[in-house]
Amino acid sequence: MPQAIPAGGALGGSTNRALDGRRLGLALGMLVLPQYVALGAPSVALPAIGRALAVPFGATAWILAAWSLTSALAMPVAGRLMARRSPVRVLVAGVVALAAGSALAGTGPTLPVVIVGRLIGGAGAGATVIAVFAVAGALPGRERIRALGIIAAAGATASACGTLVGGAVTAWLGWRAVLAIPVLALPLLPAALTDRRTFTETGERNDSSGRLDLVGAAALSVLAGSLITLLQAHSVGLPAPVTLAIAAAGALAAVGLWWRMRRLPDGFVPRRVIAARGFLPAGLVGGTIFAGYYGVLFLAPSLIEQVTGGGALEAGALLVPAAACSVPAGRLVGALTDRFASWQVSAGLAAFTVVGVLVVAAFHGPIPVVAGTALAVCGFAGAQAVLVGLAPELVAARDRDTAQGLLSFMIFLGGGIGPAAVAGLSTIAPERVGLAVLAAIPLAGLALSLTRPPITH
């Protein structure tokens, strides 16, 4: 009989009532809506941003990649902080940074200032997401899958429907208003914090008096940042000496991180977490799926505009059917985890993403672009509902917050790799060719699912 993905562990501490996964999922899903809109909405506005700021279209990929990069980097940091502090503090700090960075991005006079704002906002988004998923992931039994499915559906719908929102806002208010959309998370925060006790019942805490491994955090940050930068080095015209220096910094960071893990097993990247059975496959498979999805999200609106001759509003409206697929996908994948083995579910999600990327790359016309985007949306929504929530099942209770942060880092980093790779390849080959090459990434995730499946204890 195939092994189903088990449900999450029970919440720590005593409680006089059973937490409702649907109610909690709705509250948290509403909170993450603005930041997920911030993923899809700017993709439609990128052509307008490039024209307004007088930069090449490929350079605007940084607007998506910067957000995904710092979002991914903030997740393990937030995970370690939640092992020492209340998730409420992490959540509030994340939402404040999200709003402040988005306000800066929306008012930035040049692309570098806009990117700085997106970097700050992305870090806030990452902290918010890890706090949200930590709370939902600690629910017991089917309530966990239910809450994660609702959050995944909300995130996928918002990020893909963000193209419609972005198109409408770009057409009526301008691209700056699009980048400022995440500021709307601030008024939603009080509603999510109505039941503060929920955010304190996320299981055991460890090392509450320990110090954060800043060296390990810095090494991981430099490694991830150098990877994203190198992928886009050609598209932004970085000189060869600068590119080599970034590559050297990335290599040194990789060596330093490896040395730090051996010297400090309980550091920022604990060896016992990385070595946990199924942890690396889950993170890598999820990252490849996210890379494929965000690569499609970066290019699809531009391709539709080229084919139809319309503007941002038309492109966003045409992508709405693809967004609608996220709702049934998130719920269906959650139900399938009871019937199929984890490797079957993850392989199916990767396969959907591969096919979606290739359909968008190979076929012309708005219908194939929408159909391919819909397939990629299904993979994205399913990965959030299943793979992102696996951390509590892969490690000991005391490592859950740390593992959640690192696993989310690996998965969400793919969101930065996807558009960066497409933008970098588009400078040496046609855009569709670059997107077709990107399909190799989720294809590798499919192969990994079949050979080293992400399983739980």
Feature roles, as predicted:
Residues 103-107, 190-195, 255-258, 358-362, ...:
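Membrane-embedded alpha-helical segments of multi-pass transporters/permeases
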Residues 1-20, 202-206, 451-457:
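Intrinsic disorder in cytosolic terminal tails and internal cytosolic loops
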Residues 91, 144-154, 209-218, 274-275, ...:
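Cytoplasmic-side transmembrane-helix entry/capping segments in multi-pass membrane proteins
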Residues 149-162, 410-418:
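Glycine-rich segments within core transmembrane alpha-helices of 12-TM secondary carriers
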Residues 140-141, 197, 396:
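Helix-capping/helix-break motifs at membrane-protein junctions
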Residues 119-154:
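Cytoplasmic helix-loop-helix junction between adjacent transmembrane helices
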Residues 20-101, 132-133, 172-173, 177-183, ...:
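12-transmembrane solute porter fold
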Residues 171-284:
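Hydrophobic transmembrane-helix bundles of small-molecule transporters
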